[in-house]
Amino acid sequence: MEDLEEDVRFIVDETLDFGGLSPSDSREEEDITVLVTPEKPLRRGLSHRSDPNAVAPAPQGVRLSLGPLSPEKLEEILDEANRLAAQLEQCALQDRESAGEGLGPRRVKPSPRRETFVLKDSPVRDLLPTVNSLTRSTPSPSSLTPRLRSNDRKGSVRALRATSGKRPSNMKRESPTCNLFPASKSPASSPLTRSTPPVRGRAGPSGRAAASEETRAAKLRVSGSGEFVGLTLKFLHPSPPGPPTPIRSVLAPQPSTSNSQRLPRPQGAAAKSSSQLPIPSAIPRPASRMPLTSRSVPPGRGALPPDSLSTRKGLPRPSTAGHRVRESGHKVPVSQRLNLPVMGATRSNLQPPRKVAVPGPTR
């Protein structure tokens, strides 16, 4: 216990003065007497008194005086500094040369910053693309072609969608016979004139003459637009599956003279029915009017003459058909021979107008 008490010392005689500007400081400093005690080794964590006025003992030996330098000393210092600077510069140049020789074959990595060069007099200018003022003002065709191609693709896709999904309505709206035979000008558009041709045929020679005049008028209309009528009839009446039948065999009438004389009348009626066919109508026509147009059609597939049966098997007789048509005394155009009676036959087989434009084999 006594040893512990000797090691532990309490700060009793030390006074802490926090009033540095108090007037009593100077008086107290004068009265304080310095107690000189033997020096002991300093210990950490304890406060010790220090005398600021105590001067450390100067080491005996060479004394260094830091006074003003004489001019001779200054000149020596300057000469030595210049010599050191020249030596350092020479060493730096040697290091640079050695580094340049070592890194010569290596390619320096370009900096990420973009570098710009003036190419007015450079030979590399010939390799660059030339830009003139005209090309700046007018856009190049290559920049316009992708837009046109994309528009063409869009148009083709729309056309394919329209033809695949809405074929019957588009065929009715866009068929050229609608423009060639308007409903207001053609006399065969009204339902009254539609039902009259069979009555005229029964009236006698005067009715036949009137029918022949109508046939000539229909020829003038159809001959100018035979190609368009053929195209529309080709879309509206696809060929049925089976052996191909020549279309002229339908025109070949029976060998009786009465049928050969009555031939121009059904052709006129068929021309009228073809002019009425492509007109789009959302309201279906009554079924009572349809047999009237089918009466004026030459014999269909069920009642074909033996000549037409032989032609169906693959032995066409265009000479006999043309000869019998000429006996009637009227020249029938090729487009009317090929397509118009088939139009009447399809009308007699398919009565509702919606089924006319449906692609596929007919009944």
Curated annotation (Swiss-Prot):
Subcellular compartments: Cytoplasm; Cytoplasm, Cytoskeleton, Spindle; Cytoplasm, Cytoskeleton, Spindle pole
GO cellular component, one term: spindle pole
One Pfam assignment: GTSE1_N
PTM comment, free text: Phosphorylated during mitosis.
Coiled-coil residues: 70-94
Biological function: Required for normal progression through mitosis. Required for normal congress of chromosomes at the metaphase plate, and for normal rate of chromosomal segregation during anaphase. Plays a role in the regulation of mitotic spindle dynamics. Increases the rate of turnover of microtubules on metaphase spindles, and contributes to the generation of normal tension across sister kinetochores. Recruits KIF2A and ANKRD53 to the mitotic spindle and spindle poles. May participate in p53/TP53-regulated growth suppression.
Modified residues (Phosphoserine): S22, S47, S65, S70, S98, S122, S140, S186, S190
Residue ranges of the region described as Disordered: 39-67, 95-363
Protein name: Proline/serine-rich coiled-coil protein 1
Sequence repeats: 38-41, 68-71, 238-241, 243-246
Keywords assigned by UniProt, alphabetized: Cell cycle, Cell division, Coiled coil, Cytoplasm, Cytoskeleton, Mitosis, Phosphoprotein, Repeat
Basic and acidic residues bias: start-end ranges: 112-124
Chain spans, region 4 X 4 AA repeats of P-X-X-P: 103-246
Quaternary structure annotation from Swiss-Prot or TrEMBL: Interacts with APC2. Interacts with KIF2A. Interacts with ANKRD53; recruits ANKRD53 to the spindle during mitosis.
Ranges of compositional bias, category Low complexity: 133-148, 197-210
Similarity remark: Belongs to the PSRC1 family.
MF terms (GO), sorted A to Z: microtubule binding
Compositional bias segments (type: Polar residues): 186-196
Residue positions where Phosphothreonine is found in the record: T145
Organism lineage string: Eukaryota, Metazoa, Chordata, Craniata, Vertebrata
Keyword GTP-binding among UniProt keywords: no
Gene Ontology biological process: cell division; microtubule bundle formation; mitotic metaphase chromosome alignment; negative regulation of cell growth; positive regulation of DNA-templated transcription; positive regulation of microtubule polymerization; regulation of mitotic spindle organization
Keyword Coiled coil in annotation: yes
Tissues showing expression: Widely expressed in adult and fetal tissues, with highest expression in the adult brain and fetal thymus. Not detected in adult skeletal muscle.
